[in-house]
A protein has these predicted regions:
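Short, basic, glycine/proline-bearing loop/turn elements
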Residues: 12, 38-45, 202-212
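Glycine-rich, acidic loop segments that terminate in or are immediately followed by a histidine
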Residues: 135, 206-303
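Anionic-ligand anchoring segments at beta-strand to alpha-helix junctions in alpha/beta enzyme folds, i.e.
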Residues: 1-35
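A structural-propensity feature for long, helix-poor, extended segments
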Residues: 28-48
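Hydrophobic anchor at the start of a short beta-strand
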Residues: 13-15, 67-68, 233-234
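Short acidic, S/G/P-rich loop/turn micro-motifs used as interaction or catalytic elements
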Residues: 22-24, 45-50, 213-215
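Active-site cofactor/cluster-binding pocket
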Residues: 44-85
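A structured phosphate/pyrophosphate-recognition subdomain
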Residues: 3, 7, 37, 69-70, ...
Length: 303
C-alpha cells in the first residue's frame, strides 16, 4: 500500500528490503554505501538486544541526509520514541490496530485505487488479528499468510507478490495457491513431530522443546495452531542456529497472559532480547541459556 502511494505521488517504485527485528541493524547498514533519499521502516518492532546497533545505523543514515519514517504498532518501538525524535526519525504509531491499519487509513487514500488498497490493508489487519472480515476476506488472508510462510517462500517470491499487488492489483494468483498448499503439508508434518516434544502441559498452557528439530520458519504457526487446538497458551522453544535459542508464544483470545510482558524480561535476564505483542511474542537468548529459558518459561505458565 505504501509503495503504491509512493508510486502515484513520486512516480517511483521504491526498493523493497525484508528484515526481522533482530537483524534490522544489518539491513540498515546495507543502505549506508549508497544512501537513499528516504527510508520507510514498516511493521518491524524494536528488539531491545540490538537497539544500540539499530540506533547507530539510524544516526549514520540521518547524518548522510536520509529521511526516515518508522511505521509500527509494537510497544517496544513506542518506548524508544524519544530516542527516535532525537535522532531525527519520524514515528507513525498505533496502539489500537497494526501497521496495516495505518496503511489503510493513511496511505490507501493516496494511491490510484483507494478501494483495492484499503481491502489489501484490511487483509493485513485480519492476518494480525486486529480486524474481522467476511468469508472472502478471511479466505484471502488465510491463503496469503500460508503462501508467505511456505518453506520455499524466499524474499524473491515476497517481492514478486508486492509487485503483483502494485502493478496487477490482484490479491492472489496460482503461485500463491501452490505455496499455500505446500505450507499446509509442511505444517501438518511438523505438528505431528512437535506434539512428541511437549515437555510441559498444565491448565494454563503448554511448553514445547523443539531445539533438535528444524522448523523452517514454521514456529509461530505451530504455536498458533497448538494454542487454537488446545485453547491454551502455547510456547515453542527452538534453535534457528548454533548460537541462539528462540521461544515463540501464542495466546488464545480468552487467556489472561501478556506474552511480551512475560517473555521479554526473562530473555533480558538471560542476556537476550525480543518483543512482540500481548498475544504473539518471540524472544531469543544465547544457546548456553536454553535450559534456563525452558525452566523460566515453565514457571511463567504455572503462576
Amino acid at each position: 500500500v505504501i509503495i503504491a502511494a509512493f508510486r502515484k505521488s513520486k512516480g517511483i517504485y521504491p526498493k523493497l528490503l525484508i528484515a526481522q527485528p533482530y537483524v534490522l541493524h544489518r539491513t540498515l547498514l546495507r543502505l549506508l554505501s549508497a544512501p537513499p533519499r528516504l527510508v520507510v521502516i514498516t511493521d518491524v518492532g524494536v528488539d531491545e538486544a540490538v537497539w544500540p546497533s539499530v540506533s547507530r545505523s539510524l544516526e549514520d543514515l540521518v547524518a548522510k541526509g536520509v529521511k526516515i519514517l518508522w511505521i509500527d504498532h509494537h510497544i517496544q518501538t513506542a518506548r524508544v520514541s524519544l530516542d527516535l525524535a532525537e535522532l531525527g526519525v519520524s514515528l507513525l504509531y498505533t496502539s489500537s490496530g497494526c501497521a496495516s491499519s495505518i496503511a489503510r487509513e493513511v496511505f490507501a487514500p493516496l494511491t490510484d485505487d483507494p478501494s483495492f488498497y484499503a481491502k489489501l490493508a484490511r487483509l493485513g489487519e485480519i492476518a494480525d488479528n486486529v480486524a474481522v472480515g467476511d468469508r472472502e476476506l478471511l479466505f484471502l488472508a488465510d491463503r496469503l499468510v500460508a503462501a508467505l510462510s511456505a518453506p520455499s517462500s524466499k524474499e524473491e517470491f515476497k517481492a514478486q507478490l508486492v509487485r503483483m499487488w502494485v502493478e496487477e492489483r490482484k490479491f492472489i494468483n496460482d503461485e500463491v495457491a501452490i505455496k499455500a498448499e505446500e505450507f499446509e503439508k509442511a505444517l501438518a508434518l511438523k505438528l505431528a513431530e512437535i506434539k512428541q516434544r511437549i515437555v510441559f502441559e498444565g491448565e494454563r498452557g503448554l511448553l514445547v522443546d523443539a531445539r533438535d528439530i528444524k522448523l523452517g520458519g514454521l514456529a509461530g504457526h505451530i504455536a498458533s495452531r497448538l494454542a487454537r487446538e488446545r485453547g491454551k497458551i502455547a510456547i515453542v522453544v527452538f534453535s534457528p542456529n548454533e548460537r541462539e535459542v528462540v521461544a515463540t508464544c501464542r495466546v488464545p483470545p480468552d487467556a489472561e497472559f501478556n506474552a511480551v510482558v512475560e517473555l521479554a524480561p526473562i530473555a533480558a535476564d538471560l542476556g537476550g532480547g525480543g518483543g512482540g505483542l500481548s498475544r504473539a511474542a518471540a524472544v531469543r537468548v544465547p544457546s548456553s541459556s536454553g535450559e534456563q529459558l525452558l525452566k523460566r518459561l515453565r514457571e511463567a505458565l504455572t503462576r
